[in-house]
Amino acid sequence: MIGHNSGRTRQKKVRHEFGFWSIVVIVLLVLAAIFIVYPFAKLFYQSFFPKGGTFSLSNYAKFFSKKYYMVGLRNSMLICVCTTILGTLIGIPMAYISTRFNIWGKRIINMAVVLSMLSPPFIGAYSWILLLGRAGFITKLLEKIGIEIGSIYGFQGILLVFTLKLFPYVYMYVSTALKNFDSSLEEASESLGVHGFKRILHVTLPVIMPTILSAALIVFMTSLADFGTPMLIG
């Protein structure tokens, strides 16, 4: 009798665990495999096996022998690395100030950050052209008072737009990590004589470093995948 009841309990547990959301997850994984994994796998396979069907590195030799491709790859990597560094340097202090101090307009800042993340790349880049382009509003306004600014077109413009567009990812991730931070660690460091910036450097940042690295990776990959901004401003 006891064995029968325990078997029935296990069956109910299995049915409970393999419920609606389990089916949803399986369906999503299948769709991801069909529409994401399969195309990339096929593309990767065909890069080594051209139309003839024999193994060859000719595609890679052609890519790395063309100066045009190498310059584009180098510039893309440079933009992504610089954007990641600047976005991290802006996002972390903003997140710390926002979570540790009761500043005026905190909700407005958070709302503006979230809204900036929702705008498509083309819209964001075009907005900056309207502001800082050759005939941009801010450009013309500064020219009237005798101030000339550099062109937004080119490397510096792409870096500016990418940084201001993507640092909110770091801000949001780090803000969440700091809100969930165990305050007893900071209190313990204070009692041991670790104060101010030294406490941030040796206590706070090491604890939230996985979050910072995750946010930096998202910034890097997003800037690498963004084609609209370089096309308009580059």
Can you say where each PLM-predicted feature lies in the sequence?
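Transmembrane alpha-helical segments of polytopic membrane transport and secretion proteins
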Residues: 1-28
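Membrane-water interface segments at the C-terminal ends of transmembrane alpha-helices
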Residues: 19-51, 65-179, 205-228
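Hydrophobic positions on the alpha-helical face of helix-turn-helix-like DNA-binding modules
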Residues: 188-189, 199, 203
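A short amphipathic helical element positioned immediately N-terminal to and/or at the very start
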Residues: 11, 56-64
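Glycine/proline-centered hinge or cleavage motifs at structural transition points of membrane proteins
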Residues: 192-194, 206
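Short coil/turn motifs that cap or connect alpha-helices
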Residues: 104, 194-195
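Hydrophobic alpha-helical membrane segments of integral membrane proteins
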Residues: 230-233
